[in-house]
């Protein structure tokens, strides 16, 4: 959404499959998305829910349909299976081949010879050695070769168009060789603006009547770069900004070191921070009481004019994570059910704080959390309002049934944004160019 929207392509992101009336309200939009929670769900959930979503997208009839995955490819056979999503999407969305483009140099995500790398702490790490992703609490990544990783989730031949082909003018021939070998899923390398644009050219020129692509927002970065080169889009314009606000509320279930650093910086910047005991979510009654307590604490600070952060953890080494895992293990419920309860509870908490304090801007931190929390807020659709950091724009809410008066929101993956990100949200400012070029993970 943000990549296309800020490039001049009117874009809307729905939180549920839109009907004809909803589409008509955004008739000016040239790009339409449907946000979901598949990344935190089982293959059985996908079987029950993704076909209807894919059928809706097929009826829209876009030349390229993109199944958006995390730029660090978070997935496993039992949860967030990208392979299962591909199996369900291909017969409905078609295409002679299916580009797999996860690299996004603007986010500090690079792919070389099929292996994904990501920035953390100012250095570039291979994915299986990444300080955050190798220790992800739900989908730890132990394989950097994306074709090898994906092969655990889907039995399908996979090809590669590598840097040598992309940089040497042989990308078309490399793609043809993959297709001749029966490799319909084709991974694309990219390390810089030139290779991401060449990947975009390959996708656009070989889209056929329609194309089902898989990848991060690198797919949109690639297409935008190519469209600018051929004159379909104007050159990059000065990014928009939003007016500052006096207070914001942040709810976070992220365990990422990046979010932990943001919480610590927010505290130094005068935000009041509160721990929320996620272990209580193993018992719905205890969780309701814990959310009530967090609401009282957060509301008191907001009424005193302070911004607040309510968080379930500060980094991957927070003892709260061990307590939460133990509570989940003892609960007798599927872990994904309790994780969904945590995300939905934090969403309701944000809505209640907004309703009682007059807040108009909020933040939800945590990739898995954001989907559940946004659904709990009853958000109908989002449009991009202002860039704050790559992958974490300020968005305008549309049709937010339970958002308590919130008009603007940021849905922030745990690894997105610089240390002062929450202060940036408060100001409504946008990231500096250097931040955009090397987004820390």
Indicate residue ranges for each PLM-predicted region.
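Cap/lid and interdomain-hinge subdomains that line or gate substrate/regulatory clefts
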Residues: 30, 42-47, 52-69, 73-196, ...
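Conserved, well-structured core segments that form the ligand-binding/active-site neighborhood
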Residues: 117-297, 304
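C-terminal structural cap/anchor segments
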Residues: 298-365
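Short beta-strand segments
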Residues: 33-35, 68, 99-103, 187-191, ...
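A structural-propensity feature for long, helix-poor, extended segments
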Residues: 27-38, 306, 395-435
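Short acidic, glycine/serine/threonine-rich loops at helix termini
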Residues: 2, 25, 77-81, 109-118, ...
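Conserved, well-ordered active-site substructure
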Residues: 359-417, 421
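N-terminal basic/disordered segments at the start of proteins
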Residues: 1-27, 48-49, 103-106
């Amino acid at each position: 959404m943000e990549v296309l929207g800020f490039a001049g392509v009117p874009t809307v992101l729905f939180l549920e499959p839109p009907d004809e009336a909803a589409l008509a309200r955004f008739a000016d939009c040239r790009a339409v998305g449907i946000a979901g929670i598949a990344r935190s769900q089982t293959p059985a959930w996908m079987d029950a829910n993704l076909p209807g979503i894919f059928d809706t997208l097929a009826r829209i009839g876009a030349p390229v349909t993109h199944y958006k995955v995390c730029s660090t490819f978070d997935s496993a056979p039992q949860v967030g299976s990208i392979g299962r999503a591909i199996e369900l999407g291909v017969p409905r969305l078609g295409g002679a081949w299916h580009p797999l483009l996860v690299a996004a140099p603007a986010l500090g995500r690079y792919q070389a010879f099929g292996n994904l790398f990501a920035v953390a702490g100012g250095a570039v790490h291979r994915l299986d050695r990444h300080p955050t992703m190798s220790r992800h609490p739900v989908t730890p990544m132990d394989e950097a070769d994306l074709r090898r990783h994906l092969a655990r989730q889907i039995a399908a031949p996979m090809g590669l168009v590598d840097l040598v082909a992309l940089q040497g003018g042989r990308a078309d021939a490399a793609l043809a060789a993959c297709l001749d070998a029966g490799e319909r899923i084709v991974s694309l390398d990219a390390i810089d603006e030139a290779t991401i644009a060449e990947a975009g050219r390959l996708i656009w020129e070989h889209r056929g009547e329609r194309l089902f692509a898989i990848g991060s927002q690198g797919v949109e970065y690639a297409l935008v770069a190519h469209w600018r080169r051929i004159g379909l889009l104007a050159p990059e314009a000065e990014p928009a900004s939003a007016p500052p606000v006096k207070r914001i509320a942040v709810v976070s279930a992220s365990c990422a070191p990046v979010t932990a650093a943001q919480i610590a910086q927010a505290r130094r910047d005068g935000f009041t921070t509160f721990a929320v005991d996620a272990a209580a979510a193993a018992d719905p009654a205890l969780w309701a009481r814990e959310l009530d307590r967090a609401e009282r604490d957060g509301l008191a600070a907001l009424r005193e004019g302070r911004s607040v952060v309510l968080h379930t953890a500060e980094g991957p080494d927070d003892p709260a994570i061990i307590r939460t895992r133990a509570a989940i293990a003892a609960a007798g419920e599927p872990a994904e059910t309790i994780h969904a309860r945590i995300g939905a509870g934090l969403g309701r908490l944000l809505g209640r704080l907004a309703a009682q304090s007059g807040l108009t801007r909020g933040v939800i931190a945590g990739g898995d959390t954001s989907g559940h929390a946004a659904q709990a807020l009853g958000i109908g659709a989002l449009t991009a309002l202002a860039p704050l950091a790559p992958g974490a724009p300020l968005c305008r809410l549309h049709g937010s049934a339970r958002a308590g008066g919130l008009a603007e929101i940021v849905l922030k993956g745990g690894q997105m944004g610089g240390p002062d990100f929450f202060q940036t949200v408060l100001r409504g400012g946008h990231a500096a160019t250097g931040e955009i070029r090397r987004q820390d993970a």
